[in-house]
């Protein structure tokens, strides 16, 4: 191998060993599925002996819509209220790149949105 190739390989190894900070944000309207996904991520992090914080429970957003029950406007003026609750959790991890890739490749239940943000060092 030439010197250039050796330097490139060494640089790639250093990047893989470099510890990065990531924040995984989970969002869902279904609490059980959200808790299952967050517990799976935490278990994987504990198996790899990673520095973790969380899952941190963020305040639940409640979206409400009020509508009239009767479509034609006649009759008594009765109203119907609908609401949707949005639950959020986040988990902070510190780990090398390869281990983070393994942890984030878990199966995610339908209805759970996952956002992964990598902090710059």
From Swiss-Prot:
It comes from Saccharomyces cerevisiae (strain ATCC 204508 / S288c). Belongs to the universal ribosomal protein uS10 family. GO terms for cellular component: cytoplasm; cytosol; cytosolic small ribosomal subunit. InterPro entries: Ribosomal_uS10, Ribosomal_uS10_CS, Ribosomal_uS10_dom, Ribosomal_uS10_dom_sf, Ribosomal_uS10_euk/arc. The keyword Cytoplasm applies. Keywords: Acetylation, Cytoplasm, Isopeptide bond, Ribonucleoprotein, Ribosomal protein, Ubl conjugation. One of its GO terms (molecular function) is structural constituent of ribosome. This is Small ribosomal subunit protein uS10. PANTHER family: 30S RIBOSOMAL PROTEIN S10 FAMILY MEMBER. One of its GO terms (biological process) is cytoplasmic translation. Component of the ribosome, a large ribonucleoprotein complex responsible for the synthesis of proteins in the cell. The small ribosomal subunit (SSU) binds messenger RNAs (mRNAs) and translates the encoded message by selecting cognate aminoacyl-transfer RNA (tRNA) molecules. The large subunit (LSU) contains the ribosomal catalytic site termed the peptidyl transferase center (PTC), which catalyzes the formation of peptide bonds, thereby polymerizing the amino acids delivered by tRNAs into a polypeptide chain. Coiled coil: none annotated. The modification N-acetylserine is found at residue 2. Component of the small ribosomal subunit (SSU). Mature yeast ribosomes consist of a small (40S) and a large (60S) subunit. The 40S small subunit contains 1 molecule of ribosomal RNA (18S rRNA) and 33 different proteins (encoded by 57 genes). The large 60S subunit contains 3 rRNA molecules (25S, 5.8S and 5S rRNA) and 46 different proteins (encoded by 81 genes). Ubiquitinated at Lys-6 and Lys-8 by HEL2, to activate the ribosome quality control (RQC) pathway in response to stalled ribosomes. Pfam families: Ribosomal_S10. It is found in: Cytoplasm. There is a cross-link at residues 6, 8, 21, 32, 101 (Glycyl lysine isopeptide (Lys-Gly) (interchain with G-Cter in ubiquitin)). The keyword Cell division does not apply.
């Amino acid at each position: 191998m030439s010197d250039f190739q050796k330097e490139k390989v060494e640089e790639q190894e250093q990047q893989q060993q470099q510890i990065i900070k990531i924040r995984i944000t989970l969002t869902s309207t279904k609490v059980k599925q959200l808790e299952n996904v967050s517990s799976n991520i935490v278990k994987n992090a504990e198996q790899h002996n990673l520095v973790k914080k969380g899952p941190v429970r963020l305040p639940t957003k409640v979206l409400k819509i009020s509508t009239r029950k009767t479509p034609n406007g006649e009759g008594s003026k009765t109203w119907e209220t609908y609401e949707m609750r949005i639950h959020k959790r986040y988990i902070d991890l510190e780990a090398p790149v390869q281990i983070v890739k393994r942890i984030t490749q878990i199966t995610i239940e339908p209805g759970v949105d996952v956002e992964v943000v990598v902090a710059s060092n």
